[in-house]
């Protein structure tokens, strides 16, 4: 899962730079899942060239669910499907990855060309919560 997250971060960087974003924002919350320990989040962040913001990092699940309901993303988040993190999740995930080891394994996969190919064949769809957030910010 951690190597997959490294790939996703590298891909997100390419897309973000292409659409001229100044940062990446994730929904990670410290300790919620195995990939979200300090050590593992450091590994994921090491693949990020842009500033990485984690506004939910110190929130518990209940707080995150409340926010998701407020911004209209909760119903989507509970749809029953197996995403890539579930399908490829190891039985005993690493919770304290070592940065050097993670990069050694990542480099052995030789996926950078695949990431470039995926980016080349990208399809970008833009979604904005700006109006919702702004309306609620002013109330």
Where are these regions (language model features)?
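Small/polar glycine-rich anion-binding or flexible loop at a beta-alpha turn
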Residues: 32, 80-88
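RNA-binding accessory domains that recognize and position tRNA/RNA substrates
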Residues: 46, 94-109, 117, 123-139
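A short alpha-helix-loop-beta-strand transition element characteristic
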Residues: 72-81
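Glycine-rich, flexible loop/turn motifs
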Residues: 52, 74, 95
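Active-site adenylate/phosphate-handling loop in enzymes that bind or generate adenylated species
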Residues: 1-66, 70-71, 114, 119-132
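Short secondary-structure transition/capping segments
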Residues: 36-39, 88-92
């Amino acid at each position: 899962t951690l190597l997959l997250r490294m790939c996703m971060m590298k891909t997100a960087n390419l897309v973000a730079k292409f659409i001229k974003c100044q940062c990446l924002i994730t929904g990670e919350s410290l300790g919620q899942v195995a990939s979200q320990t300090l050590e593992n989040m450091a590994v994921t962040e090491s693949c990020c060239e842009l500033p990485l913001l984690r506004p939910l990092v110190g929130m518990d699940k209940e707080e995150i669910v409340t926010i998701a309901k407020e911004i209209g993303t909760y119903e989507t988040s509970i749809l029953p499907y197996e995403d890539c993190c579930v399908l490829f999740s190891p039985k005993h995930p690493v919770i304290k990855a070592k940065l050097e080891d993670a990069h050694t394994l990542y480099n052995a996969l030789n996926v950078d060309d695949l990431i470039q190919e995926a980016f080349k064949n990208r399809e970008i769809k833009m979604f904005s919560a700006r109006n919702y957030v702004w309306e609620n910010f002013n109330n």
